[in-house]
Amino acid sequence: MGYSGAMSTLLSLRACLVLPLVLTALGACATQTELRRAAQQEQFARESASQGDWAQAMRSYAAAADNVELGHGDFAWQARLHHQAGRAASGACRYDAAEFHFRQAIALAKKSEHSSALSEKALESLQAGKPCGVPR
């Protein structure tokens, strides 16, 4: 093998070693970006809820929950966001969405070994037909 062939092999080997490290670093940056975005969306959702804009709060909490999942955030945070999305959906009279988010919150709370009692109670209250426009 000549000098140029050895150099070519060495460069290929180096690229094979460096590429996974670069891809891992980019993945970590993407994860942190998703989690930061989730925190911002959660804050926006809180502001919307405080102004009584339940539909926007529901969308923002749901988007935050999606970003926590994409960013590999913990199950407890995802559960809390889904619970809040369920409450906001209930306030917006979107019972189908509320039920979905409460069920997601219950499943995620169990995965995180945290209590799912609040979401279970909210789901029961939803099924009991409490008045529309009142968050659970």
Question: What label would you give each PLM region?
Answer:
Residues 40, 74, 81, 119-122:
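The tetratricopeptide repeat
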Residues 30, 67-75, 110-115:
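Flexible helix-coil transition and linker loops at the boundaries of alpha-helical arrays
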Residues 62-68, 104-108:
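Amphipathic alpha-helical segments of tetratricopeptide repeats
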Residues 35-36, 76, 117:
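Residue signature of alpha-solenoid helical repeat architecture, marking inter-repeat boundaries
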Residues 23-44:
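Bacterial Sec signal peptide processing site at the extreme N-terminus
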